[in-house]
A protein has these predicted regions:
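A short helix->beta-strand "capping" segment at the edge of beta-propeller domains
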Residues: 5-32, 65-67
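Non-transmembrane, interaction-prone segments in cytosolic or luminal domains
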Residues: 20, 62-68, 95, 116, ...
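Short loop/turn segments that connect beta-strands within beta-propeller blades
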Residues: 62-65, 102-105, 141-145, 190-194, ...
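A short beta-strand motif characteristic of beta-propeller blades
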Residues: 20-26, 67-72, 107-112, 145-151, ...
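Alpha-helical structural elements
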Residues: 17, 40, 65, 105, ...
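Generic low-polarity alpha-helical segments
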Residues: 7-8, 18, 37, 46, ...
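Repeat-blade elements of multi-bladed beta-propeller folds
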Residues: 2-7, 28-58, 72-99, 112-138, ...
Length: 320
């Protein structure tokens, strides 16, 4: 497990490089670290998988030195990045439930059964925790009580759950009778459970991940499906543009700044498209092959995780 400091480039304050803060050998495979909304400078959390024990563990870590403050078993911790929900840490329990533990002590506080497979992220919206179970979205309060259920008949919901103008945006699959196949969709649902509109992303084998779903910017949603990057105008529920890229990009959403859209693919391509029309600005091919996570933007730097390495790219040009 590694913590690196982000250091400013002396010649350009908007570009950065990394150096080690600390590095600790772990007797397990380390998954994605995560933090609370306030991005505490003191504590972080991580899920690990021990092949020897064949078990997942949820750990609380001191960010100053990497010391493990507590560790608990996390059944099915391998899917779905956990989240911090006030003074609780919530993660998936088995395949169809979520469980909350005290962020202070790691003691179990409550669990909520969804009844069907959970393939969404865990999302905190207006002091409630939202997740999807099969074709249903559930909202849970800090006491572990289900306070709302929204249903999309015959669907399977996956990816992130995003608030938009009092409603909820989510993605999922549904059988398209006209095309006689399963297609991915983007839905906007109001708080009463009515589907305001449904937008087809396209025919695609679903390979969902912790970063599937959409990127929301103002009144525009950016999504990926198969080999396509797609932009939707949410004010009218209409697709604005669609761009084909090299490799499967539907596993995770693109990321967006004020002018451009950045994507990665399972063929090892990192690319940048114009936010207005989807035209490709630059492409970069990595010999590492599979890139299974979206890039991250920090200043003028684009962070890309490819295989076992983190690459820092100039986001304007794509140069490493």
């Amino acid at each position: 497990m590694i913590r690196k400091n982000i250091i400013k480039n002396k010649n350009d304050k908007q570009r950065y490089f990394l150096n080690d803060s600390w590095r600790i050998e772990m007797p397990a495979v380390v998954r994605t670290p995560f933090y609370g909304n306030n991005c505490s400078e003191y504590f972080g959390y991580v899920v690990t998988y021990s092949e020897m024990e064949q078990a997942y563990h949820l750990l609380k870590v001191d960010l100053h030195n990497g010391k493990i403050l507590w560790s608990i078993d996390a059944v099915n911790g391998g899917y779905g990045t956990p989240t911090v929900f006030g003074d609780l840490v919530v993660f998936l329990k088995e395949f169809d439930a979520v469980q909350a533990v005290s962020a202070e002590s790691g003691i179990v506080e409550w669990a909520v059964q969804g009844g069907h497979r959970v393939r969404t992220t865990l999302n905190v919206i207006d002091e409630t925790l939202w997740f999807g179970s099969g074709s249903t979205l559930l909202a849970v309060n800090k006491n572990g009580e289900v306070v709302k259920k929204l249903h999309i008949p015959n669907s399977f919901i996956y990816g992130n759950i995003t608030p938009y103008k009092g409603g909820i945006l989510c993605t999922g699959t549904l059988h398209n009778n006209e095309r006689d196949c399963s297609c991915s969709y983007l839905w906007l649902i109001n708080q009463e459970g009515s589907i305001m509109y449904s937008m087809e992303l396209g025919r695609s084998p679903v390979i969902s991940s912790d970063t599937s779903g959409i990127w929301l910017k103002d009144d525009f949603a950016f999504a990926s499906c198969g080999h396509d990057i797609i932009c939707f105008d949410l004010k009218v529920g209409k697709e604005l543009w669609r761009t084909r890229v090299f490799g499967f990009c539907g596993r995770h959403f693109p990321v967006v700044d004020s002018q451009r859209v950045y994507y990665t693919t399972l063929k090892g391509e990192v690319g940048c498209a114009d936010i207005l029309n989807g035209s490709i600005v630059w492409r970069q091919k990595f010999r590492e092959g599979l890139i299974v996570a979206p890039p991250s933007i920090y200043g003028k730097t684009l962070f890309v995780l490819a295989d076992c390495s983190v690459f820092l790219l100039d986001k304007d040009t794509g140069e490493i």
